[in-house]
Design a protein with these regions (language model features):
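Short beta-strand segments
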Residues: 176-180
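Nucleotide-activated sugar donor-binding and catalytic core shared by glycosyltransferases
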Residues: 1-174, 184-305
C-alpha cells in the first residue's frame, strides 16, 4: 500500500526461474525488477526478509542506501549446517547495515555484523486484534513447507492430515478443520475418506478465521505459528515433522517457548493417545499472555538507522 501511494502499482510476483534453494536470484527478471524499482524509488532504507544473495547484490549496486535484513535465529547460528555454509550466509547477511534476528530464542552477534539485534518474533498485525472465544472447532494448520519441498516433508504433512481425519471419527462432538496451503496437498487429502465433521480448506485462511474460535490448534513447530500461539495463549499440539534440518529447528523452537498450553508430539503417535491429548487440551482454558512480540524493538531499530 505504501508503494502504491507513491505510484508503484505494478507489484510483481516471483516465478520459479527467479529463485534457487537459498533465495531470490539477483540476476534474473525479479532481481532486475527490484534493482530498477530501487533506482526509480530511491528509498532511504530497504528492508529485506532474509534473501542472502539479494542482500549482497543490493549492497554492491546501491552502496549508499541503508539496508536492514530480517533473519531467523537459524539463519545466523545453526549447528545442523556445516561451518562453511554458515560462514557464507553470515558474510552475505552482514552486508546489511542492520540485522534484526527475530524468533523464539535469543542469539548474540558473531562479530561480523555492523548493527545487530536479537528479539522475539515479529507478529502479523492481525494477530494483535484476535478476540478468542470458546467453540467446538479444532484447526489443523498444515501451513508452510507444502510447496517446493522434498518428499520426506510432504509425506509428513500428509501423515498429519490423515491423523486428524482419523481422530475426527473418535471426536464426533467437534469439527475438525484441515487447512491446506497448496492444491497438491488438498487434492491428495481429498482422495481419502472424509468424516462428516471434517472440513477441508483448499487455501490458507486469514488468521482471524481460525484463531478467533479455535478450541485447539494442531500445527508443526515453526517459529511464526508457535510465536502466535504463545502470544494468544490458545491450547495447541505441535508436531515435529520433516527432514533432519527442519526437525532440529522445530525442536529448538519448542524448547525455547516452554509453554504449558503447547504440547509436542511425533507424527507416528498412536491414534488413541493423540485423541486423548486432544480431549485433554480442549478442556483447558487459554493461558495468560506472556509472550511479548518483537515488533516494537524492530521498528525502533529501523527508525534509528
Amino acid at each position: 500500500r505504501y508503494l502504491e501511494s507513491h505510484g508503484f502499482e505494478d507489484i510483481r510476483e516471483a516465478i520459479p526461474m527467479d529463485y534457487c534453494s537459498i533465495g531470490l536470484l539477483p540476476t534474473n527478471k525479479m532481481g532486475q525488477y527490484i534493482h530498477q524499482t530501487i533506482r526509480t524509488f530511491n528509498p532511504n532504507v530497504v528492508l529485506i526478509d532474509g534473501e542472502p544473495l539479494l542482500t549482497h547484490s543490493l549492497r554492491i549496486s546501491h552502496p549508499n542506501i541503508k539496508i536492514a535484513v530480517l533473519l531467523n535465529p537459524a539463519d545466523v547460528r545453526n549447528d545442523e549446517n556445516d561451518k562453511e555454509s554458515m560462514d557464507y550466509f553470515n558474510t552475505l547477511y552482514a552486508c546489511a547495515d542492520l540485522a534484526i534476528v527475530h524468533g523464539l530464542r535469543k542469539i548474540t552477534d558473531n562479530g561480523t555484523y555492523r548493527d545487530f539485534v536479537s528479539t522475539n518474533t515479529i507478529l502479523r498485525p492481525e494477530i494483535m486484534s484476535v478476540y478468542h472465544k470458546t467453540s467446538k472447532n479444532i484447526y489443523c494448520v498444515l501451513g508452510g513447507g507444502t510447496v517446493n519441498v522434498g518428499h520426506q516433508f510432504a509425506a509428513s504433512t500428509m501423515a498429519l492430515a490423515e491423523l486428524c481425519q482419523q481422530a475426527a471419527v473418535l471426536m464426533s462432538d467437534y469439527t475438525m478443520h484441515i487447512i491446506c496451503s497448496s492444491s497438491n496437498i488438498y487434492d491428495a487429502i481429498n482422495e481419502n475418506y472424509t468424516p462428516n465433521n471434517v472440513v477441508l480448506h483448499s487455501h490458507v485462511l486469514n488468521a482471524s478465521d481460525y484463531y478467533n474460535d479455535a478450541c485447539l490448534i494442531i500445527t508443526r513447530s515453526g517459529r511464526n505459528t508457535l510465536s502466535e500461539l504463545a502470544f494468544l495463549g490458545i491450547p495447541a499440539i505441535s508436531v515435529i515433522t520433516g527432514d533432519d534440518y527442519r526437525r532440529k529447528e522445530q525442536t529448538q523452537n519448542l524448547k525455547a517457548i516452554n509453554s504449558d498450553n503447547i504440547k509436542a508430539i511425533p507424527t507416528n503417535i498412536d491414534l488413541v493417545e493423540f485423541v486423548a491429548l486432544c480431549k485433554k487440551l480442549v478442556d483447558t482454558s487459554c493461558v495468560q499472555r506472556t509472550f511479548i512480540p518483537g515488533n516494537d524493538t524492530a521498528i525502533r531499530k529501523i527508525l534509528s538507522m
